[in-house]
């Protein structure tokens, strides 16, 4: 107060330029999100075209071995296409909830291999796990190989079987994926660390790419058969 009078001070600042910049940044970010979404959509469509070409190739041969190879390649492509489809459908364009992906991919593979001779029961124990696309695709390919191998070989000598998938996070730092079956088990002469089959070689290479670890052992839950259990420990970042 000065001689009994109150004095007020006001500062005016022109922020119109800052607002213009903020709006431009917001518009630019929205445009980039749309472009990224479109990229995932186009990648998915291109992969589906490749898958369709494999289907046409398969229709041109009656050789069972060639058909099997074509179908294996087709499944690998479809597993990658499904990743891009899930991201395209999601609000988060940088990550995918692998929990939903596991169930969808396994079900898709199961339906393609299903025969009347074998009654395989699928079971899932899946936690929500967010993965960036550069980790989701290798994990998807690993899942594809193990599911396909189990459906092709594990139950060849039995009419019923169980295939179980467990997905969880440990210490908020690593993904743990377990794929197990109660089938005949992997023969003793086949060592995972040196197996020459393309599927198991892919699993080894992809696990190393992710800086992960894999353990292969007899399924301890089996009572009448050896079974197989793969356990993967993969860093989330």
Regions found by a protein language model. Give the residues of each.
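Short loop/turn elements at sensory-signaling interfaces that couple input to output
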Residues: 1-8
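Sensory-domain boundary capping and coupling elements
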Residues: 10-12, 84
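PAS-associated C-terminal cap
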Residues: 13-27
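Histidine phosphotransfer helical core of two-component systems
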Residues: 27, 32-34, 42, 47-96
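Conserved short strand/loop->alpha-helix "switch" segment adjacent to the catalytic nucleotide/phosphoryl-transfer site
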Residues: 30-36, 40, 62, 94-96, ...
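Glycine-rich/acidic phosphate-handling loop/turn and adjacent ATP-lid/helix
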Residues: 174-200
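Glycine-rich ATP-binding loops of the HATPase_c
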Residues: 211-222
